[in-house]
Swiss-Prot record:
The record marks D95 as: Stabilizes the basic form of H active site to accept a proton. GO terms for molecular function: peptidyl-tRNA hydrolase activity; tRNA binding. InterPro entries: Pept_tRNA_hydro, Pept_tRNA_hydro_CS, Pept_tRNA_hydro_sf. This is Peptidyl-tRNA hydrolase. It catalyses: an N-acyl-L-alpha-aminoacyl-tRNA + H2O = an N-acyl-L-amino acid + a tRNA + H(+). Gene3D superfamilies: Peptidyl-tRNA hydrolase. Its main location: cytoplasm. The lineage of its organism: Bacteria, Pseudomonadati, Pseudomonadota, Gammaproteobacteria, Pseudomonadales. Keywords: Cytoplasm, Hydrolase, RNA-binding, tRNA-binding. One of its GO terms (biological process) is protein quality control for misfolded or incompletely synthesized proteins. HAMAP family: Pept_tRNA_hydro_bact (MF_00083).
Length: 194
């Protein structure tokens, strides 16, 4: 399968949104940058924080959009368009209401499932939904009317520790993801639970 050239971490900008459930994807990309020893730098051209590193001679770019979640596609389309990165060479990390905290799953393609960040990325990529997703479980409040406050809220410590563990599990399968070994990455990641 295709190797990844761009990893996007979704979230909302600003200190008031740091450590909220909705910023799980951004946290994942921050952890990659930390592990790689690189700084993410604000780049107005790409509407986000960007970084770059090499893995076994392969150039991999990181992006955390600094637009609000529902405009994430603006950043993804700008960077992917400039560097000629195809949708299937993109991994988007995002919070997932349909998975419990401590669970992370990889998925290729599909709809947006009501996630406004994914919805905008699909639209901005010309209705291309073939990009890969890292779904980081945050759980569900149980009632649809509570979702907005839930995702924009900070998780209790025990829940945050589970999210951190799922991010660690996902970091552990990155070498397989970089190599395009999706089946192996999925098998290893999907067998983990915090």
């Amino acid at each position: 399968m295709t190797a990844i050239k761009l990893i996007v971490g979704l979230g909302n900008p600003g200190t008031e949104y740091e450590q909220t459930r909705h910023n799980a994807g951004a946290l994942f990309v921050e952890r990659i940058a930390e592990k790689q020893g690189i700084n993410l730098v604000a780049d107005r051209k790409y509407f986000g924080l960007t970084g770059r590193f090499s893995h076994q001679g392969q150039d991999i770019r990181l992006l955390i959009p600094t637009t609000y979640m529902n405009r994430s596609g603006q950043a993804v389309a700008a960077l992917a368009g400039f560097f000629r990165i195809k949708p299937e060479e993109i991994l988007v990390a995002h919070d997932e209401l349909d998975l419990p905290p401590g669970v992370a799953k990889l998925k290729t393609g599909g709809g947006h499932g009501g996630h406004n960040g994914l919805r905008d990325i699909i639209a901005q990529l010309g209705n291309q939904n073939t990009f890969h997703r890292l779904r980081l479980g945050i759980g569900h409040p149980g009632v649809a009317s509570m979702v907005s406050n839930f995702v924009l809220g900070r998780a209790p410590r025990a829940e945050q520790e589970k999210l951190d563990a799922s991010i660690d599990f996902a970091l552990g399968v990155l070498p397989d993801i970089f190599a395009g070994e999706w089946n192996r990455a999925m098998k290893n990641l999907h067998s983990q639970k915090a």
